[in-house]
Amino acid sequence: MGGFECADHLNAFGNRVDFLELTNHLQNIDSDYRNLAEFAISTVREGIRWSYVERIPYNYDFSVVKIMLQEAHRQGIQQVWDICHFGYPVDLTPLHPHFTGRFVGLCKAFVQMFKAEYPGETLIVTPINEVSFISWLGGDVRGTSPYGVHLGWEVKYALMRAYIAGVKAMKELMPGIYILSTEPLVNVIPPLNCSEDDKVSARNAHLNQFQSVDILTSAMCPELGGSPDLLDILGFNYYYNNQWIIGTGDFLKWANEDFDPRWKPFSQLLKDAYERYHKPVVLRL
């Protein structure tokens, strides 16, 4: 799977970031897709950019999305769509009382548009990209909206309430839709020669990576209405710094650079995640 960065969030300085514009992907989508053939890639992740699509509440402009869909169909590319990739309309944050209703409205409008344009075709969506990361970024370290500190759990809870409601609305409109979660896959470890408390803290932090999908599947917070049926495919992101030592800010080096017995092979991380949910797994870029 290939991917084109589609984040549209407010950065730490309150300025809107639009990576589809910054990378010129929209202007070069024809050649971007043609270049995939060199690598035998025919599936890509894209994003609709919520902040662009819904500039007025409940009024949706999918004109750019339709152009992207048309180009994909012309070249035989399967798109996987992020509905929310870090960005929200200017009048919304995850903690706003209208957030869930607005997100459900967006999900329904997107599915209805797709069905009208391409009836009977397969649609794969990630409702909200990396809930684990964006709830930390916006809720704990003031990196984006709502610019909070010690609000990470509250932001995550609000995002997952909207996520679940959005999935239910989409599956009602299109029972054959595929829901692909996308979360970071990490390994959080204690320092060497650590105390038992350090080990417990690291273990708890490691398990926190699963909270979002646990909520989606109703293993946590069942009051939000999650269910295993709401998840079809497990998607993970994995980067060079996805294994770190708790409380230090230090990342483990790749195993082939400087072996550390605490390093966990990526294959083992994937196996652990699969055994937790027993869903097909996709590595997303």
Which residues fall in each region the model found?
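Non-catalytic scaffold segments within catalytic domains of secreted glycoside hydrolases
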Residues: 1-27, 33, 37-39, 53-285
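Active-site gating/metal-coordination segments in enzymes
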Residues: 45-48
